[in-house]
Amino acid sequence: MNLNQLEYFCAAVECGSITKAAKKLFVTQPAISGAIRELEKEFSVTLFSHTRSKLSLSADGERFYERAERLLREVETAKMQLHDLGGSRQPVSVGIP
C-alpha cells in the first residue's frame, strides 16, 4: 500500500466515480482502477459494490475509507509541520579544540 493508492481510493469515494476521480487528480482511469484493485488484492477485500450507474462502498470499503482519509490528513499535517520547522532552522556552530 502506498499514499497514491490511498489518495486514488479516497478520490473515487469522494467523487462517486472512477472517471471523475481520474479527472480530478489528472491521471488516467486505469491508474485509479488499478490502485483500487491492488488495495483489494493486498487486503483480500472488496472495497466497492459496482453498479451500472453508481460506485458504492462496501462495508469493508467504508471502514477502510475512514482510516485512509485519516492517514492522508495525518500525512498532510506532518508535511506542513516539517515545512514550518524547515523555515525556522538556525545554523549551529560547532567548535572543535
Write out the residue ranges for each language-model feature.
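Interdomain hinge and pocket-entrance segments immediately C-terminal to HTH DNA-binding domains
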Residues: H83-P97
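A short LG(V/I)-centered, amphipathic sequence patch enriched
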Residues: E40-L57, E76-K79
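The N-cap/first-turn positions of alpha helices
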Residues: N2-Q5, Q29, G61
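Short alpha-helical "packing" element that flanks the helix-turn-helix/winged-helix DNA-binding module
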Residues: Y8-A12, F64
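Alpha-helical linker/hinge and terminal dimerization helices associated
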Residues: E42-F43, F64-G86
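Short helix-boundary/capping micro-motifs
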Residues: A12-F26
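Helix-turn-helix DNA-binding elements, focusing on the entry/boundary residues of the two helices
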Residues: S17-I18, I36, H50
